[in-house]
């Protein structure tokens, strides 16, 4: 009625609640202890069909409540020393990580499409053009680009190591970083027929990454630069991320509006 498009974000395999309630679904180390991230939060096993069903049923509930889209986040394998020694319970040479992630999203997508719901996957921006990152987290950009309806690479400049894209500090170069990342996306997905290709809707940085050496403050200017980079790469959609949900309205103004505001100050 109000022309608002609703998206339900569901965190997938980093799930300490499910891991505690169903320990047999938790991803474990050889000593039987759960695999946890840097904050001590447990992960469940992305190979387990019971986990797929749980995540699909959660999404179906959201669809029944009226959400237009399901956005699966943390739809990947964990990283770190714990993850490297985890017991996944399968022959990972015969069934690699990337296939498990693709199979889960196809499984959930089939069910959710029956309810008329759009299915989106959040992925690391660094998987674009990096086979090493693909193998680590199990997110294959090209494969997922023809599995889900929309794909959202997290191309936050702060998440690229200094020197990437030939930039001394990517975080200090928001336009150049996002443009390079999105041009990489265009190149990687170009062989997929347009009718079969996912919509690309990148996550953009709406926060200041104080932990990055050489970082800059992110305000309206930096947000607008990233948005322009998306457009200049040939894409039309984008979303912003700030973990505290504090967003700068200035970043959403058009060039004419910014100029008017500056003239009125």
Where are these regions (language model features)?
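Active-site beta-loop-alpha junctions enriched in small/polar residues
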Residues: 11-15, 75-77, 124-128, 156-158, ...
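Aromatic-lined substrate-binding rim segments of carbohydrate-active enzymes
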Residues: 1-11, 80-119
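Glycine-rich, aromatic-flanked loop segments that form ligand/cofactor-binding clefts
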Residues: 1-34, 69-72, 114-116
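The substrate-binding groove and active-site-proximal loops of carbohydrate-active enzymes
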Residues: 39-53, 90-99, 166-175, 213-217
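Aromatic- and acidic-residue-enriched segments that line the glycan-binding/catalytic groove
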Residues: 15-38, 78-92, 139, 172
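Active-site-adjacent "subsite" loops/lids of carbohydrate-active enzymes
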Residues: 13-64, 224
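Substrate-binding cleft of secreted/luminal carbohydrate-active enzymes
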Residues: 148-159, 171-265
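An active-site-proximal structural segment forming one wall of the substrate-binding cleft
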Residues: 40-76, 136, 140-147, 229
């Amino acid at each position: 009625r109000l022309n608002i498009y609703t998206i339900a974000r569901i965190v997938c395999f980093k799930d300490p609640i499910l891991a505690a309630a169903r320990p047999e679904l938790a991803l474990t180390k050889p000593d039987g202890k759960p695999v946890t991230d840097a904050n001590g939060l447990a992960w469940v096993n992305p190979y387990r069909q019971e986990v797929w069903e749980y995540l699909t049923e959660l999404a179906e509930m959201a669809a029944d409540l009226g959400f237009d889209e399901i956005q699966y986040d943390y739809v990947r394998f964990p990283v770190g020393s714990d993850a490297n020694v985890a017991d996944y319970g399968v022959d990972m040479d015969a069934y690699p990580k990337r296939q498990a992630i693709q199979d889960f999203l196809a499984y959930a997508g089939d069910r959710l499409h029956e309810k008329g719901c759009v299915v989106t996957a959040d992925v690391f921006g660094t998987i674009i053009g990096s086979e090493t990152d693909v193998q680590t987290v199990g997110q294959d950009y090209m494969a997922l680009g023809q599995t889900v309806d929309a794909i959202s690479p997290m191309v936050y400049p702060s998440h690229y190591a200094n020197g990437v894209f030939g930039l001394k500090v990517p975080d200090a170069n928001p336009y150049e970083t996002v443009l390079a990342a999105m041009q990489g996306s265009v190149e990687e997905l170009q062989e997929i027929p347009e009718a079969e290709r996912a919509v690309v809707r990148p996550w953009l940085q709406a926060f200041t990454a104080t932990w990055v050496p050489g970082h800059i403050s992110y305000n309206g200017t930096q947000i607008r630069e990233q948005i322009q980079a998306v457009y200049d790469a040939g894409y039309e959609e984008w979303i912003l991320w700030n973990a505290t949900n504090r967003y700068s309205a200035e970043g959403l103004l058009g060039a004419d509006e910014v100029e008017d505001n500056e003239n009125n100050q």
